[in-house]
Each structure stands twice: as C-alpha cells, then as structure tokens.
C-alpha cells in the first residue's frame, strides 16, 4: 500500500504428505528488532474500562500479548502494538514500527529477547486450542500482519494505519455508515423512546 506506507505479510503453509498434518503454531510474521532502548505500547482493558494504553520497555525474557476470547476480544487485549526503537514513545517524534494483526479471533503477539543483539517479534493466531488439520495439497493462509514505519513517533504510525484503512483496507471506508446505539451502556434498564431519541441527538 504505497499510498499509506503499509506492507502486509502472511504465511502460506502446505505439504505433500499422504495423510493430514496437524498444525499447532500459526505465525503470520517474524521480525528481528535490534536491541537498544526499545519500548512497546499496546491496548488492554475490560468491561467499562476499555482501551487503556500500556507502555513498557522490552527487557530480557519473553513478553506475550494474547487473547483467547474469540470474537469478543475488542474490549480486552488488542492485536496491535507500537514498537518505539529509540526510547520511551512520543507522539510526534521518534522511530516507531507499528504492527496490526488483521484478525478478529484468538491471537498472540510475542517478543523473545535472548542474550544476543535482537528482540524477536512473532505475530499470529493464538495456538492455544487452535490446532488445524491440514490436508495434503491444501493451503493454509494465516491472517495478514500489517506493518508500518514512522520517524514521526506514534502519531506518524497511527496516521499511516488510518490512511490504509480509508484507502481500501476497510470496505467502503469513505461511505457514511450507520451507528449502533448502545442503549445498555447509556441507560441500562431505563429504556424508553424519549431517552433513545435524546441519546441519538447527543451523537
């Protein structure tokens, strides 16, 4: 996506054995990142406490961001991460790699930091309870991982993702869309026509 500074990567798995092969890991991408003052930013939350930004440095060992809630994962952990390469992330300056897994199901993002000069980033389907029986000559295609690079901080990476969504990744992204009115969060059990009309006017 040259108009958005986004690349997508994925993995295609096939085999020519006589019997099905059981797949147990589904990495869409692997990215080595040179060690330094590297930080990550990601979203975590829960009911009524969604999308809280967590920012932390990468240290030796393993860091895993994952979800096993299936299609209900949008209010807990998100399958996106910003990787700041030159210190604590800033909004408008600094080198940032943005990564977003294009997948609404169970996911796993993992950083392995060993005793060498790299952090190793893996992204894909969460392998917990996700085994897949791959038939001979069948092709299993993992979800895409969208990646961008910015030297304008978190904001620059975020704007690239917005352009990518508007310029074609999201179907009819520039068309007006209906809005779902969440009456439960707004009024709980006190639902009536007058209240609903007022909520719509407040949008």
Where do the protein language model's features map onto the residues?
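An acidic-aromatic substrate-binding cleft motif
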Residues: 160-203
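Active-site beta-loop-alpha junctions enriched in small/polar residues
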Residues: 26-28, 104, 147, 181-186
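Primarily single-stranded nucleic-acid-binding OB-fold modules
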Residues: 112-116, 186-187
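Polysaccharide-binding surfaces and accessory modules of carbohydrate-active proteins
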Residues: 1-112, 128-130
């Amino acid at each position: 996506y040259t108009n958005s500074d986004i690349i997508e990567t994925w993995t295609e798995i096939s085999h020519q054995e006589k019997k099905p092969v059981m797949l147990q890991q589904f990495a869409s991408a692997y990215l080595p990142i040179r060690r330094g003052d590297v930080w990550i930013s990601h979203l975590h939350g829960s009911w009524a406490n969604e999308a809280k930004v967590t920012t932390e440095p990468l240290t030796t060992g393993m860091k895993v961001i994952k979800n096993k809630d299936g299609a209900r994962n949008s209010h807990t952990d998100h399958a996106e991460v910003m990787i700041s390469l030159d210190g604590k992330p800033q909004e408008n300056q600094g080198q940032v790699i943005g990564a977003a897994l294009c997948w609404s199901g169970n996911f796993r993002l993992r950083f392995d930091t060993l005793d060498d000069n790299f952090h190793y980033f893996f992204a894909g389907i969460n392998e917990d309870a996700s085994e897949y029986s791959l038939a001979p000559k069948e092709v299993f295609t993992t979800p895409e991982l969208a990646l961008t690079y910015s030297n304008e901080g978190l904001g620059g990476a975020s704007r690239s993702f917005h352009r990518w969504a508007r310029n074609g990744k999201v179907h009819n992204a520039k068309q007006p869309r209906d809005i779902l009115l969440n009456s439960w969060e707004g009024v709980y059990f006190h639902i009536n026509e007058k209240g609903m009309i007022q909520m719509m006017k407040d949008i």
